């Protein structure tokens, strides 16, 4: 039997990204495409271990896609999707392992990373930041659509995660180094 690879955040992200793009472009066809992608993820990513966030994401995206398909309310479904995704990140901060740590801990000794306070603190901060970003994304998406400037969302909702990804890459190096040097009050 083949040994499974470590979890990949792509397992969680592929259904969400497909959902936000496909349902935004065409609610009816996009929701069907998203359901097909979500149902294929366990096969596509079969060589990787799954974590709870992968499983919850597949279920949440499938439910939101079904709602969009049945009601034609793609806008509301995608807005709720941003909220749910953000809440996943925030709720994970109430557990022993923030969402991002479930994936990146394997780069830092696996389960042993939980004993590293710098690793854990950094990941709790990043999980909270991603959670806040997506909860705010749900809010501004709803408000901008109501204000009639929904076209702006194409730029904003794609740019913000890119900027947050750049920030994450910087922060995960800078923050632990700063704490290790003792130059940050705790």
List each language-model region with its residue ranges.
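Short, amphipathic, aromatic/basic-enriched membrane-interface segments that mark the entry/exit
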Residues: 1-8, 24-29, 45-55
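Alpha-helical transmembrane segments of multipass membrane proteins
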Residues: 16-21, 40-44, 63-67, 139-143
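Structural signature of hydrophobic alpha-helical transmembrane segments
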Residues: 20-37
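Membrane-interface helix caps and helix-loop-helix hairpins in membrane proteins
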Residues: 25, 48-51, 69-76, 151
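C-terminal ends of transmembrane helices
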Residues: 38-49, 172
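Cytoplasmic-side transmembrane-helix entry/capping segments in multi-pass membrane proteins
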Residues: 51-62, 77-84
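Membrane-proximal helix-loop-helix units in multi-pass membrane proteins
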Residues: 72-121
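C-terminal membrane-adjacent module
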Residues: 109-186
């Amino acid at each position: 039997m083949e040994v499974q690879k470590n979890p990949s955040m792509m397992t969680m992200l592929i259904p969400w990204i497909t959902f936000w793009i496909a349902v935004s472009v065409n609610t009816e066809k996009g929701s069907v495409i998203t359901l097909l992608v979500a149902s294929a993820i366990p096969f596509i990513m079969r060589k990787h271990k799954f974590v709870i966030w992968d499983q919850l994401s597949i279920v949440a995206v499938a439910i939101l896609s079904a709602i969009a398909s049945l009601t034609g309310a793609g806008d509301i479904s995608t807005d709720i999707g941003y909220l749910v995704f953000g809440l996943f990140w925030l709720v994970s901060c109430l557990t022993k392992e923030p969402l991002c740590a479930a994936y990146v801990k394997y780069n830092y000794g696996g389960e042993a990373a939980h004993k590293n306070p710098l690793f854990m603190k950094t990941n709790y901060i990043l999980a909270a930041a991603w959670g806040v970003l997506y909860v705010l994304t749900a809010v501004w998406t709803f408000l901008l659509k109501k204000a009639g400037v929904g076209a702006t969302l194409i730029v904003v909702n794609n740019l913000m995660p890119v900027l947050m990804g750049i920030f994450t890459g910087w922060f995960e190096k800078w923050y632990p180094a700063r704490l290790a040097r003792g130059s940050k009050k705790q």
